Amino acid sequence: MSFTVVGSNIYDTTLLMTRKGQNGAPDEVIPRPGFLTLLLNDIDSLRTRVELHNLIDNLNLATNEDYVKFAEYRTLFSQTTDMIRLAYTNGQPAVQTRATDSRTGSVFYANTLTGDKAGNLFRLLAPIAYRYLDVGLPRLFSYIHAQIGTTPAFRYNFDIQPIIKLAITNEPLDYGEWIGQEGIHELERNVMIILSCSNITILAVLSIVGLGVGSHIMTSAADQEAWVGSPFMLSTDNFGNARPFTAPNPSYAQTLRLPIPRIFSAPNRPVWVQSKTSETQSVSGSTHSDEKLTAPM
């Protein structure tokens, strides 16, 4: 599994893990928001990954205010050598660790942290998750767009559970106060985003189930052909009907607007989250095999 870093700080970094496609299928790229890996690993552990050296050197983590906040949790997860993720179990926050069934060999995730400690961790992560949606997700899309036509087709399997939920419950951005619980439930059903730019289109389908989000970003020629020329971003309104949003700027590199998470209109509240992407991206990568660090989501 190859490993690439896209980003320059805790809030805009995405870790891209690439798996070789089976039986002629395109390689699968798994983007994971980087803030969980960066915040829940001590600096020495992070330095065991060559790909992270430049990022760690530039961050000065030891004095970073957000990094300091998570000292207790770094101690708690210090013995974790496999992937962890955040999840909601029966509506309650939980931290899960990847495990292997000794009888069948199948991989599953078991709860390793629940209750108040998990809830406190989620509250600490909420504002960081919102910042990732605002600056990290647009940067990732910009990176993916730059790869189209220069590399073989990849299938981007993007699991950002439960960042959307974290972001929409972040004080003072509590969407329950703005649109009510019915609006929250509608938001958790289905959202489709189409990003169009010139002759290239990136299709991102966010299928929102329960309190989590799973999405697939496809950049194959077939997907491009199917959606080229579409000038819209689509989302569902609070009645479940698809509605178009005219792309505000055909130059993708200059401006990217995402209807995440501000899907619904509210009095005196902006509907759009607007993020400007820089022309230069800080990207580093290598091809070390397997993943040993605590990985996000």
Swiss-Prot record:
Keyword Transport listed: no
Lipid bilayer topology: Single-pass membrane protein
TM spans (from-to): 191-211
Record keyword Membrane present: yes
Basic and acidic residues composition-biased segments: 288-297
Covalent S-S links between cysteines: none
Annotated source species: Cryphonectria parasitica mycoreovirus 1 (strain 9B21) (CpMYRV-1)
UniProt region (Disordered), positions on chain: 275-297
Cellular component annotations (GO), alphabetically ordered: host cell membrane; membrane
Keyword annotations from UniProtKB, A to Z: Host membrane, Membrane, Transmembrane, Transmembrane helix
UniProt protein name: Uncharacterized protein VP9
Predominant cellular place of this UniProt entry's protein: host cell
Protein's cellular compartments: Host membrane
Composition bias, Polar residues: 275-287
